[in-house]
């Protein structure tokens, strides 16, 4: 019996020691499994929040709009830099000491006067049924042309733009925004020097039908001839001042004779001064009236010789 009891005790002790070893091993494995599970749950939560805030459609639309705004701002800066710095080059390349009028206008671009801009002819856009597939757009505002839109067509190059767009452009530029050709015909320095040194005189002759107040046209005794003489003054050239306007002297010669104190007769003569812009308007009015009178064959204009 003693041997059997000793054998059973040894078996129990070995089993208890094995169970202790196994329990200690299971606790370490369980702890490692719990730590790994917590890491997996934390990673899944982070992935969920990332997908919710960065992959949502609203955030994608906001990001696309922000990228579009940055792209437009970058393209706008690039366009302005190209317009202001890079001049248009002649087709033949650079010539020694010679620059094209378009390049000169680009470097010294100060815009045009409002009266010059308003003189550019207008047109009304009409859609062409044969070219419906090709949509035309204004290169300044990048807007499509629609039927009934008003535009201006430049004389030299023939390009057309919206009235509001080209008026704003020409207020600070003097060239075409598409081909960079000058809007106004370039005048050489030699011609400018001749205009500044020599007094330019232009004469226009008109006839005025004068009748006293209260009388009929049948009682008109005759015609009255008035001769206008326009001359550009040289005061700006002598003094060195340049205010952008030339003074023009207008002398009016009247055929009606007046008697002086000595009993002699002399023609009436009056003179006045005005700016060159006002005188040019007066000359255009006189030329239009003279052309109408020539068409009607009534008192054709005649240019008097200054020597007489």
From Swiss-Prot:
Q: What EC class does the entry list?
A: transferase
Low complexity bias: start-end ranges? 272-291
- Where do the record's region annotations for Disordered lie? 252-308
State a single Gene Ontology molecular function. ubiquitin protein ligase binding
Q: Where are the transmembrane segments?
A: 29-49
Subcellular compartments: Membrane
Where does each RING-type zinc finger lie?
A: 138-180
Signal peptide range equals none
Which pathway or pathways does this protein act in? Protein modification; protein ubiquitination
Which reaction is recorded as catalysed by this protein?
A: S-ubiquitinyl-[E2 ubiquitin-conjugating enzyme]-L-cysteine + [acceptor protein]-L-lysine = [E2 ubiquitin-conjugating enzyme]-L-cysteine + N(6)-ubiquitinyl-[acceptor protein]-L-lysine
| Protein's UniProt keywords contain rRNA-binding | no
Task: Cite the InterPro entries for this sequence.
Answer: ATL1/ATL16-like, Znf_RING, Znf_RING/FYVE/PHD
Q: What is its EC number?
A: 2.3.2.27
Q: Name one Pfam family in it.
A: zf-RING_2
Its placement in the membrane is given as: Single-pass membrane protein
Keywords for this protein: Membrane, Metal-binding, Transferase, Transmembrane, Transmembrane helix, Ubl conjugation pathway, Zinc, Zinc-finger
Q: Which GO terms describe its cellular component?
A: early endosome; endosome; Golgi-associated vesicle; plasma membrane
Family per record: Belongs to the RING-type zinc finger family. ATL subfamily.
Q: What is known of its domains?
A: The RING-type zinc finger domain mediates binding to an E2 ubiquitin-conjugating enzyme.
Name it: RING-H2 finger protein ATL63
In its UniProt entry, the species of origin is given as Arabidopsis thaliana (Mouse-ear cress)
């Amino acid at each position: 019996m003693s041997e059997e009891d000793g054998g059973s005790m040894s078996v129990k002790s070995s089993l208890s020691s094995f169970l202790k070893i196994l329990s200690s091993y299971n606790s370490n494995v369980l702890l490692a499994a719990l730590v790994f599970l917590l890491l997996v749950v934390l990673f899944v939560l982070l992935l969920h929040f990332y997908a919710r805030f960065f992959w949502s459609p609203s955030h994608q639309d906001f990001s696309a709009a922000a990228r579009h705004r940055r792209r437009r701002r970058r393209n706008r800066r690039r366009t302005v830099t190209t317009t202001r710095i890079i001049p248009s080059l002649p087709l033949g390349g650079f010539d020694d000491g010679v620059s094209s009028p378009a390049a000169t206008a680009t470097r010294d671009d100060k815009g045009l006067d409002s009266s010059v801009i308003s003189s550019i002819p207008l047109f009304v856009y009409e859609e062409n049924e044969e070219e419906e597939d090709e949509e035309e757009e204004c290169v300044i505002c990048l807007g499509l042309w629609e039927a009934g839109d008003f535009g201006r067509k430049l004389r030299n190059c023939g390009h057309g733009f919206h009235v509001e767009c080209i008026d704003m452009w020409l207020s600070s530029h003097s060239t075409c925004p598409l081909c960079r050709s000058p809007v106004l015909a370039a005048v050489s320095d030699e011609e400018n020097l001749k205009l500044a040194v020599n007094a330019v005189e232009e004469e226009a002759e008109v006839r005025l039908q004068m009748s006293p107040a209260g009388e009929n046209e049948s009682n008109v005794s005759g015609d009255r001839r008035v001769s206008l003489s326009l001359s550009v003054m040289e005061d700006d050239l002598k003094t060195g001042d340049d205010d952008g306007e030339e003074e023009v002297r207008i002398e009016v010669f009247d055929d009606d004779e007046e008697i002086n104190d000595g009993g002699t007769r002399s023609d009436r003569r009056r003179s006045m001064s005005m700016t060159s812009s006002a005188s040019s308007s007066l000359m255009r009015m006189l030329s239009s009236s003279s052309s109408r009178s020539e068409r009607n064959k009534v008192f054709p204009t005649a240019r008097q010789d200054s020597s007489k």
